[in-house]
């Protein structure tokens, strides 16, 4: 993020460029993207298992509780999608490649920093629970953050070195020196958080009192996320950049030092820019000047007034308005009710699918959820005025396509994906919210290939995850086994268990059973973290499930939540689900695990019964019985009744030792066998 090497440079000179703060009794504008990455990577969370979202949520809650204790009022500003120019695409692709390498490293036991897939959604859910004010910008948030902080005369909290360039009235506090875990007290009563604040005045003073207005030119010459022109190397190689007196630390920042010392000789950006252009071929000067000036604008005040959103709920973004998007979409994006994935698809007809810690030798885990995305794309087709106006009714038909940047092996590629043609009343995005709840729910469930009746016994909070699980089970590329399904459903019991434990008026016996089961789950989770090797096939299967859940949630949000959004903070824990997989494979049975808590046992039965009818019959076969399809068909053709009898006998034996729902599975197997022979 930001300018390469600048953050480490200013930190090497922290005594000169930073002042100590005792932060309390103030507003603070927080870079949400930087914060959730920092909390994810600096809190000893295990990143191998696809997200311990409960642990992450606890860390986020503690962070904001520290702020509240110091009477610090946070305003979180999140990045949105890419802007219409898509000028960061090269940078985003480079980062995608880096993430693939880090995900691969994590998958084979190495180190790396890869955010779990749903971390942003979890972060937003915690903000909502804690009633922390937040906004999601239409595109990148940096300028809006700077403008709001200057309006309120308060500091910015981030880790982005771009904030060393912005002229902030009250300064910029880097996250890595923001000691929220080490609250101190003044006179025994007033809490404060020790922090460091970057001083732009001290920075400019260090470089011969250079004009602050030169810093945006420095940023684009040095190379930031927006500009990386090969021709600038011509300037850097020809200009004799003065390094000044450098310490051993300074040698690794020779380009930064040289540029700053060189720029400090000029009175203003115009004079400096003219001198830059002298080193370039004449034929390139005009184009380079235009690009540099345009990039320097990124460090000026934003036209967006976020204070209006926080005070009145009004979000006005000129760039978004110019696209002519429906009002309800703009409002939902600002409130974080729609993901930046949606705005990227809307504005650019291009999305980037993030890599998870998965099996790099298999097709990427997002392939399984592509049909859901095709429905999302179909809903978005008629809402991008700047794109081709090709009609679905044109002859010959020319379906409008979207591009997806996805992982292939350990690299990326761009795939062209056709949107699904939808009924006329579904294809007008501006009127999508006018559809009845029943019709919106029907479209969601039809996409997930799930009957509504299946979900009737399921608690409201789990309807969407169970519908998604049914979708996941129906896809042959999933390769899920029974213990994968069982582990997933057991993990979904955590939220209800916490509700029982915290519910007043529950009988002591019920509460004790819930506490014991919850404690057992915590033990399994802790034990998993001590393990050394990741089961890559299992990891890939659960990455596929998370992709289905993410896209199911995005479709649900786009349809104005016909099913309630699940509480992700208590729905999925990667360490727990992997640990349960290991236990169920070894010796533990679901029956014995749930025997201490009848309420959890009953809920599990509802969840299992809902999903089992969508699972392939093979996953219910005992170990050693899952032969190839051809062998099963051959045996069925030679002796239908004999085969059915053997299957029943083996399954009953498995049921008696392991799972009380086995009889239900036997009935399902017999029906499946009879249906196969009728065909």
Swiss-Prot record:
Keywords: Hydrolase. Residues 625-645 are annotated as: Disordered. Residues 351-400 are annotated as: Interaction with SHLD2. One of its GO terms (biological process) is double-strand break repair via homologous recombination. Residues 626-635 have a biased composition (Basic residues). Gene3D superfamilies: 5'-nuclease. InterPro entries: Asteroid, PIN-like_dom_sf, XPG_DNA_repair_N. Its EC number is 3.1.-.-. SUPFAM superfamilies: PIN domain-like (SSF88723). Pfam families: XPG_N. One of its GO terms (molecular function) is 3' overhang single-stranded DNA endodeoxyribonuclease activity. Structure-specific DNA endonuclease that specifically cleaves single-stranded DNA and 3' overhang DNA. Contributes to the control of DNA double-strand break repair choice by antagonizing BRCA1-dependent homologous recombination (HR) and promoting non-homologous end-joining (NHEJ). Recruited to the single-stranded DNA ends by SHLD2 and cleaves the 3' exposed DNA ends, therefore inhibiting DNA end resection (necessary for HR) and promoting DNA end protection (necessary for NHEJ). PANTHER family: ASTEROID PROTEIN, PROTEIN ASTEROID HOMOLOG 1. Belongs to the asteroid family. Interacts with SHLD1, SHLD2, SHLD3, RIF1 and MAD2L2/REV7. This is Single-strand DNA endonuclease ASTE1.
């Amino acid at each position: 993020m930001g300018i390469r090497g600048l953050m480490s440079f200013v930190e090497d000179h922290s005594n000169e460029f930073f002042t100590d703060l005792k932060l309390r009794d103030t507003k603070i504008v927080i870079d949400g993207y930087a914060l959730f990455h920092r909390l994810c990577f600096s809190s000893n969370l295990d990143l191998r298992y696809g997200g311990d979202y409960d642990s992450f949520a606890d860390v986020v809650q503690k962070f904001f509780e520290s702020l509240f204790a110091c009477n610090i009022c946070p305003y979180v500003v999140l990045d949105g999608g890419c802007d219409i120019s898509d000028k960061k695409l090269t940078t985003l692709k480079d980062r995608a490649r880096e993430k693939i390498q880090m995900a691969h490293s994590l998958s084979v036991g190495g180190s790396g920093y890869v955010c779990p897939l749903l971390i942003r959604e979890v972060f937003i859910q915690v903000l909502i629970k804690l009633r922390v004010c937040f906004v999601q910008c239409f595109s990148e948030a940096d300028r809006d953050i700077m403008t709001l902080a200057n309006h309120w005369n308060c500091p910015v909290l981030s880790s982005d070195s771009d904030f060393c360039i912005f002229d902030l009235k009250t300064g910029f506090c880097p996250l890595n020196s923001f000691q929220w875990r080490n609250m101190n007290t003044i006179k025994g009563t007033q809490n404060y958080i020790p922090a460091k604040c970057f001083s732009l005045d001290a920075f400019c003073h260090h470089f011969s009192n250079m004009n602050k207005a030169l810093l945006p030119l420095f940023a684009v010459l040095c190379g930031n996320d927006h500009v990386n022109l090969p021709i600038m190397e011509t300037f850097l190689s020809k200009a004799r950049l003065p390094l000044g007196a450098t310490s051993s630390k300074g040698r690794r920042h020779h380009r930064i030092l040289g540029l700053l010392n060189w720029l400090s000789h000029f009175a203003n950006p115009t004079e400096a820019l003219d001198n830059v252009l002298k080193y370039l071929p004449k034929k390139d000067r005009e184009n380079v000047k235009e690009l540099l000036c345009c990039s320097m604008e990124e460090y000026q005040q934003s036209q967006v007034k976020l204070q209006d959103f926080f005070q009145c709920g009004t979000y006005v973004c000129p760039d978004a308005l110019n696209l002519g998007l429906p009002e309800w979409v703009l409002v939902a994006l600002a409130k974080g009710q729609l993901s930046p994935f949606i705005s990227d698809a809307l504005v650019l007809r291009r999305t980037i699918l993030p890599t998870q810690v998965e099996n790099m030798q298999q097709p990427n885990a997002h392939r399984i959820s592509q049909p859901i995305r095709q429905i999302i794309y179909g809903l978005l087709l008629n809402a991008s005025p700047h794109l081709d106006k090709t009609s679905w009714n044109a002859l010959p038909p020319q379906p409008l396509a979207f591009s997806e940047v996805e992982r292939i092996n350990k690299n990326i590629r761009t795939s062209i994906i056709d949107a699904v043609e939808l009924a006329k009343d579904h294809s007008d995005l501006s009127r999508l919210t006018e559809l009845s709840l029943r019709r919106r729910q029907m479209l969601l469930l039809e996409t997930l290939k799930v009957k509504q009746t299946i979900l009737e016994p399921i608690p409201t909070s789990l309807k969407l995850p169970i519908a998604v699980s049914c979708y996941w089970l129906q896809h042959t590329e999933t390769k899920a086994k029974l213990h994968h399904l069982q582990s997933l459903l057991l993990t979904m019991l955590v939220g209800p268990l916490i509700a029982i434990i915290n519910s007043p008026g529950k009988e002591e016996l019920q509460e004790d059973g819930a506490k014991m089961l919850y404690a057992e789950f915590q033990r399994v989770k802790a034990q998993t973290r001590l393990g050394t090797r990741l089961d890559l096939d299992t990891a890939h299967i659960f990455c596929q499930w998370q992709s289905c859940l993410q896209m199911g949630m995005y479709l649900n949000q786009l349809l104005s939540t016909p099913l309630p959004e699940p509480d992700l903070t208590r729905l999925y824990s990667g360490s727990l689900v992997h640990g349960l997989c290991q236990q169920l494979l070894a010796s533990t049975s679901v029956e014995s695990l749930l025997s201490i808590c009848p309420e959890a046992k009953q809920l599990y039965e509802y969840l299992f019964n809902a999903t089992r009818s969508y699972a392939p019959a093979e996953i219910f076969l005992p170990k050693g019985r899952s032969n190839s399809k051809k062998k099963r068909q051959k045996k069925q053709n030679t002796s239908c009744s004999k085969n059915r009898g053997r299957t029943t006998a083996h399954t009953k034996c498995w049921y008696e030792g392991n799972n009380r729902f086995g009889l239900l599975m036997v009935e399902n197997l017999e029906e499946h066998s009879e249906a196969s022979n009728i065909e």
